[in-house]
Amino acid sequence: MIVLSVGSASSSPIVVVFSVALLLFYFSETSLGAPCPINGLPIVRNISDLPQDNYGRPGLSHMTVAGSVLHGMKEVEIWLQTFAPGSETPIHRHSCEEVFVVLKGSGTLYLAETHGNFPGKPIEFPIFANSTIHIPINDAHQVKNTGHEDLQVLVIISRPPIKIFIYEDWFMPHTAARLKFPYYWDEQCIQESQKDEL
């Protein structure tokens, strides 16, 4: 039996979200044949021991806390990302749900609906510590640290591994967006898996 105390009803939303993420991680199935796996025992891991990199994107620190490729997760994937001031995600969309929990810092979410031929001018939403963001499926978006300190977010996606379509700008046609799969943090493991299959 697992007992997870999250305090009173007035507990921080971060504690609640992180607790739910830990439960999902605990009850998820692991795939022993997953490439580059960090799976099996121990179920509880020290987050400081997980791989962290910027994957060629200055100002980004990415860590897959629980993922499909690295840990064998089937339904959700959880990342911890830190953006230095001025750094940003590419303009992109994906066919999965995405939720951000802002742990610290501030920034801007740029979000455009994708019902036309191209995203168009995005709507700007300020984001800040203890705010949550829900990205609708296939809506083009970008997160940028527009603050003066690091922006740290916990990101939860559905249906991993993620397949991302990247735009050069907000007026690039959807049909011209470039598919990036596997995504940067899954590349090495998926390439090693393909080599093993030959």
Curated annotation (Swiss-Prot):
Disruption phenotype: Embryo lethality, when homozygous. No visible phenotype was found for other null mutants. Reduced auxin-triggered phosphorylation status modulation of RAF-like kinases (e.g. RAF20 and RAF24).
Residue numbers binding Zn(2+): H92, H94, E98, H141
SUPFAM superfamilies documented for this protein: RmlC-like cupins
Regulation: induction: Up-regulated by auxin.
Disulfide bonds: C36-C189
A single MF term (Gene Ontology): zinc ion binding
Signal peptide: 1-33
Membrane-topology descriptor: Peripheral membrane protein
Protein name as it appears in the record: Auxin-binding protein 1
Localization per record: Endoplasmic reticulum lumen; Cell membrane
Effect noted on mutating V99A: No effect on activation by auxin
A GO CC term attached to the entry: plasma membrane
Annotated phenotype, changing T89V: Slight reduction of activation by auxin. Slight reduction of activation by auxin
Result of changing H94A: In ABP-M2X; strong reduction of activation by auxin
Function summary: Auxin receptor that controls cell elongation and cell division. Involved in embryonic morphogenesis. Acts on the cell cycle, endocycle, cell plate formation, and cell expansion and contributes to the control of auxin-related gene expression. Controls root meristem size and mediates auxin responsiveness. Involved in activation of ROP GTPases in response to auxin and regulation of clathrin-mediated endocytosis in roots. Acts as a positive factor in clathrin recruitment to the plasma membrane, thereby promoting endocytosis.
One of the GO BP terms on file: positive regulation of cell size
Post-translational modification as stated in the protein's UniProt record: Glycosylated. Ubiquitinated by RMA2, leading to proteasomal degradation.
Impact noted for substituting H92A: In ABP-M1X; Strong reduction of activation by auxin. In ABP-M2X; strong reduction of activation by auxin
Lineage per the UniProt record: Eukaryota, Viridiplantae, Streptophyta, Embryophyta, Tracheophyta
Subunit structure: Homodimer. May interact with the GPI-anchored plasma membrane protein SKU5 and its family members. Interacts with TMK1 (via extracellular domain).
Effect ascribed to mutating H92Y: In abp1-5; defects in pavement cells interdigitation and decreased interaction with TMK1
Organism from which the protein derives: Arabidopsis thaliana
Residues with attached carbohydrate: N130
Effect on the protein of changing P90L: Slight reduction of activation by auxin. Slight reduction of activation by auxin
Keyword DNA damage: no
Stored InterPro entries: Auxin-bd, RmlC-like_jellyroll, RmlC_Cupin_sf
